[in-house]
A protein has these predicted regions:
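Extracellular Ig-like/FN3 beta-sandwich strand-entry sites
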Residues: 321-323
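Sec-dependent N-terminal signal peptides
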Residues: 4-15
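A sequence-level detector of short linear motifs
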Residues: 317-319, 336-337
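N-terminal catalytic or cofactor-binding beta/alpha core of small enzyme domains
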Residues: 18-290
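Boundary of Sec targeting at the N-terminus
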Residues: 17-18, 316
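Residue-level detector of functionally pivotal "anchor" positions at catalytic/ligand-binding pockets or at interdomain
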Residues: 290-317
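C-terminal tail/sorting-segment detector
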Residues: 325-342
């Protein structure tokens, strides 16, 4: 005989660190060069190369242009995640400066040179990312940074870089597995318990999920390795903000094929990418990201199953708390991870 356990999910109203940023609202740095849209999901979207501002007092120090379509696609991705989670908000950090005057995917001296305003914008970009990471760590216990770029490689695919280069992806599974602790998803695939090969190139990898929706992607079951093709396997920011060196926030370097981000494809691609991101997070992190005002999740449990204790992510026994990931330990040895959002 079974009984139903009902979990009520309510509209989120989560505080953000000491500043209490409001989910869905924009906050700007000096001169509006950098924008932070606060969120309440364990998802961060980084947009470093979509800006077009070229103030006269900021010198051109980089010979590079905008990742065309990345600004618009990132905003559509943001909107689509809100829609597909029934009102939850991802975090998003945007550089509005043209990357030729400040390139936030490099260390500061290379990125901004000696110009004080450019250097300040660099700090703002990364400080806003750190703010969102701090909030996610406190409220969810883990999360993921997705940095949006564009590529024009002749293979015509979106590239998902997790810190594993083509030299390893082109090799055996055992060779790929040897890179687990050197990847930008180290936390997810060690402490988080996710299968590294699946996260890298399986059907439920981000590339696999996107590829299954008709958008050619690598790595994925269709393209398990780049072979000799073009492939960006990581960037300075995904090393910095992912879990390679520390922390519980993982990172993906998302090199979107530029044609996918063109006007004719942009809406559908963004919608499919958002669904892929949400599926990836739910599958590998075990999250339920749904901000429906009144919705019920039904979980079947055996009638003789008794709750022994509830613990936080550090294993400390704790009473039930909202907006916090908790572990429910039962007398049959099973453990359930849940978060109740209000």
């Amino acid at each position: 005989m079974k009984k139903l356990l009902l979990i009520l999910l309510c509209l989120p109203m989560i505080g953000f660190g000491q500043n209490n940023f409001i989910p869905g609202q924009s906050y700007f740095g000096q001169h509006n060069y950098v924008e932070y849209i606060a969120g309440n999901l364990p998802i961060i979207i980084g947009v470093p190369h979509g800006g077009t501002l070229m103030p006269a007092n900021l010198p051109v120090i980089h010979n590079r242009g905008v990742d065309n379509g990345s600004f618009e696609t990132s905003h559509l991705l943001y909107d689509s995640i809100i829609q597909h989670t029934n009102g939850c908000f991802p975090h998003m950090i945007i550089s509005h400066l043209h990357p030729s005057v400040m390139n936030p995917v490099r260390e500061i001296d290379t990125a901004a040179g000696t110009n004080i305003e450019a250097r300040n914008a660099w700090y703002e970009f990364h400080d806003f990312i750190d703010t969102s990471k701090f909030d996610i760590t406190n409220n969810w216990g883990a999360g993921h940074y997705f940095e949006m770029h564009g590529n024009g490689h002749s293979e015509m695919w979106t590239e998902i870089g997790l810190g594993v280069s083509k030299n390893y992806l082109n090799g055996s599974d055992s060779l790929i597995l040897s890179r687990t602790n050197y990847s930008t998803v180290k936390h997810l695939c060690t402490n988080g318990g996710a299968d590294f090969l699946e996260v890298i190139k399986g059907p439920t990898s981000l590339g696999g999920l996107l590829d299954s929706k008709g958008w050619n992607s690598v790595p994925s079951p269709s393209n398990p390795s780049p072979d000799t093709g073009g492939f960006f396997y990581a960037g300075w920011n995904t090393w910095k903000h992912g879990s390679r060196y520390s922390g519980v926030i993982d990172a993906s370097h998302v090199e979107n094929y530029y044609v996918f981000m063109q006007t004719s494809n942009r809406n559908q691609y963004s919608s499919d990418l958002s669904n892929s991101v949400i599926e990836f997070m739910n599958i590998h992190y075990g999250f339920v990201m749904d901000c429906t005002t009144t919705s019920v999740i039904k979980i079947d449990t055996q009638s003789n199953k008794q709750l022994l204790m509830t613990t936080d992510i550090l294993g400390q026994e704790t009473p039930c708390r909202k907006n916090t990931p908790l572990f429910y330990i039962y007398d049959d040895g099973t453990v359930e991870k849940r978060i109740v959002i209000e």
